[in-house]
Amino acid sequence: MSFVNAHFVTYVQDLGYHKMVAAGAFSLIGASAIIGALLLGHLSDRHGRRKLLSFSYHLRALGFIVVLLSMGIPFLDIPPLGLPVLLTGIILVGFSWNAVVSITAAYASDRFGLSQLGTIYGAMFAVMPLGSGLGAYLGGLLYDARGTYDIAIWTNIALLILAAATVFSIKERRSSGTDMVAAH
């Protein structure tokens, strides 16, 4: 998501919107991220982490597709669909953004137990910034080379679908032991 943090406001301005619209749209990502993390995290307690984590990645990919539709997809002869479509895509991207963090933490706890959570979670989030930084950097390089973010966004979509499929293929199991906390 650092690609979004680093490039989103510029992207919306490149679509022809005023910088205040771009900044407001970016804040919409944050607002919908809070709701998504709480709702999808809660639903993962009831319906399984793997399914909801995979759903979150798919939802973000769909959000990016909707964002692309807002600017039009020339090779598919789809004209720009405008600001309402852009805002819809933004909400989908934001809604799924922090849900991944909350569900991943819960999944790590379920899978490895609370006694290992700090180590597992710390290792995961020590590695994730490397990919995030690389994504933001490569997105900027692609923009500089092509003058558009479309390749970077399509790459995000492909990687999100791959992540969703990978997560969905993992067998779900809970840690055995006394370090589990009962859900209330």
Residue map of PLM features:
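Extracytoplasmic gate region of multi-pass secondary transporters
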Residues: 1-40, 101, 135
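Interfacial helix-cap and linker-helix signal at transmembrane-aqueous boundaries
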Residues: 12-13, 43-44, 138-147
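Cytoplasmic membrane-interface "Motif A"-like loop-to-helix N-cap segments
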Residues: 46-58
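C-terminal ends and interior cores of transmembrane alpha-helices
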Residues: 59-78
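Hydrophobic core of transmembrane alpha-helices in multi-pass small-molecule transporters
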Residues: 81-99
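Intracellular juxtamembrane helix-capping segments at the cytosolic ends
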Residues: 99-112
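A membrane-interface helix-boundary motif in multi-pass transporters
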Residues: 141-159
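Multi-pass alpha-helical transporter architecture, strongest
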Residues: 157-184
